[in-house]
Amino acid sequence: MIDLVEEARLGAAGAAPPRAPRVSVLMANHNGSAFIADALASIQRQTLRDLEVIVVDDGSRDDSVAIVRRLAALDPRIRLLERDRSAGPGAARNAALAVARGDWVAVVDSDDLIHPERLKTLLTKAQADGADIAVDDLLIFSEDETAPPRALLSRMLGGAPRWIDLPAFVRSNRLFGREPVLGFTKPLIRREALRLAAVAYDEALPVGEDYDLLARAMARGLRLRAYPDLTYFYRKHRVSISHRLDEARLEAMAANAARYRAEVEVSPTLDAALSVRERSITAARGFVRIVADLKRGAILKALRTGLRSPTSAALLTIVVGDRLTALARGPATPRRTSAAGRVVVLSRQRVIGSTNGSSTYLLSLCRALKARGLSLEFLGPSPGTFGRWPWMRLTPEMAVFDRVRVRGGWRVGDLLIAQDPAVLGSALLTGLERLLAKLKLKSSGWVKPAPYAVSAAAADVDRLYVAERARGAGAIVADYAFLTPLAPYALTPGAPCFVVMHDLFSSRTASFAAVGATDSVATLDPEREFELLSQADAVVAIQETEAAAVSAANPNQKVIVAPLAATPVAAASPGEGPLLLFVGSNTAPNVVGLRWFFDQVWPTVRAAQPEAVLTVAGNVSRAFATVPPGVRMLGPVPDLDPLYARAAVVVSPLTTGSGLKIKVIEALGRGKAMVATSVSLQGVEELLRSCVLRADDPDLFAAHVVGLLASADRRVAQGEAALDRVRRSFSPEACYGEFVEAIAGDAS
């Protein structure tokens, strides 16, 4: 008997039924208390919000029903159906199908996980392609971590979607075959097509019920499309049944195969495929008998079975191969899930030290976590991080990480060396380009820039790298919104993800368009950016304005404001003579802002102060072949302290961009007088009103600079005001306290 236990949430009797959802997720459960909460949580986190979850409990005797009830009380999308006695997974799924209301139905097992973007991605692609059935690739992982995670379909699909016809589908389900078993996949099916085909699960099957349903549906004309997206996480553990075979299960599969032949129209190609699968079932039955006899010590009986069925005996090589593989792999890696305080930082940045604003901010956050006693690991899942650098030298600042690993790199002391020789070739070409440009023999620009690694699309090998190395983290820190889709591949549902957003990328497009420029990094539309951010448990925003934008778009998401902390010097200094300083990396906001300063501000400053000198530090210098008189381009500088000490005035003339301008806070911490635009002060303008001179008009900007150059006393007074503000508002405790406590509580 089935009892529905969600009437109270659906309303009183006679109330209008709720609108049908896009997707009904069907979940059969039998004694699944160990994993069902995580499975349901992964469904609740879907970016496709318009769904229902139908859990059919198949006579469980553990507390899994209580777990589902508790979650259903908090989320009306979850419905629970209960069976007094176990009737098997097919019967449970038929019960769920009978009450499903979605346009599509998706199967998720109670011990598995799905990626937050899975349902939206599959549904969008299936509808665009006209598929009735959509399946994705499976990431297969072992609960005890004795085998590395792997993808099921990657070799079959080769990274591209593929239509699967019925004979190919049947043939792939040969037992102990070399081809991936498509019957293991968990389908998304158009419900109306399934209804018209009059297909249901075979309730006599203890395993292989998804294969049978899809084979029957395809025999009645439904079209199956397989996609390479690695978004279903299939868990292997000691009590799961889907990968275990015994005599009774194989007998049920043989009987099902016979019924299938009798009920569908069998073409010659389908007949051949069915025969391959049927022979594999027969061989597997003999193999199971041989293994059982060997375990009982009935050697002669096992030998006779092997002689009668050489194919069955040949399957013993699989067991031997598995044992040899296990021996070659060595003892199982100790489980890491018990390691308290382990924080894994996922990043595609080229982080080697405080060489640019985003690296400075990330390392500052990490130092605060380290001071709290947490263990930090830097994990770079993509070799694209190297760009055109054949090696990266890690500065002493990287000691904040207990371990630094980048895929495609060798660690040798403080060096990370790219394994791909093409990177060295690119570096040599780039060096040649710069030399020829400097000698005026050839203009620059003929060497194609390396892609912006931070926003690059992840490959399956990146995902598997995270799955193997981030497993068991207490918390995940995603460096930029682009990294949040990688966090679930840590396969640790209890580990919260904190995304360090750095910038609100979707605001940058309009900002650059307003000044007739193009961003040097990635562009994101607001919908996609907020969707990426929503996949994290908490967003770490660098300033209030962007935090407010996230809260407005994702009202149920935790947002932590954590501006860059600064360590103030003891006292302000006036600097030396008419010396100005600008510090910046080679990014579009710095390039555009500096050009504006050169064209609109610098001539006025030089007219009033002919001895004025502007020192530019950082690789922004690479963007300028020529500079105005009085400008010195230093390039990257290992130690900025002497430059700040000598500078009379620090300028930040940015006219576009987002985030908190890291160099503004750094300069204030050095006790320097500063002139900045409103873009440079975005998010902290009111806070810094008393200690930074603001100007968006070029003449006013120049007047502020000239006035400060003329008065050492004014510079010192403004520098002291800056130090006072830093001490009160930008100490590590003030900036990072909430973030550190949130992540420390979750990671411990």
Regions found by a protein language model. Name each.
Residues 663-666, 673-677:
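Short hydrophobic beta-strand element within catalytic cores of glycosyltransferases
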Residues 231, 645-659, 670-672:
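Acidic donor-binding loop of glycosyltransferase active sites
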Residues 2-17, 176, 219, 224-337, ...:
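C-terminal subregions of glycosyltransferases and related glycan-biosynthesis enzymes
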Residues 417-485, 514-535:
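Conserved nucleotide-sugar donor-binding subdomain of glycosyltransferases
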Residues 357, 713-743:
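A charged, aromatic-enriched C-terminal amphipathic alpha-helix characteristic of glycosyltransferases
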Residues 2-248:
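Nucleotide-sugar donor-binding/catalytic module of glycosyltransferases
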Residues 361, 552, 561-645:
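Conserved catalytic-core segment of nucleotide-activated headgroup transferases in glycan assembly
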Residues 498-499, 506, 530, 534-570:
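Donor nucleotide-sugar binding/catalytic pocket of nucleotide-sugar-dependent glycosyltransferases
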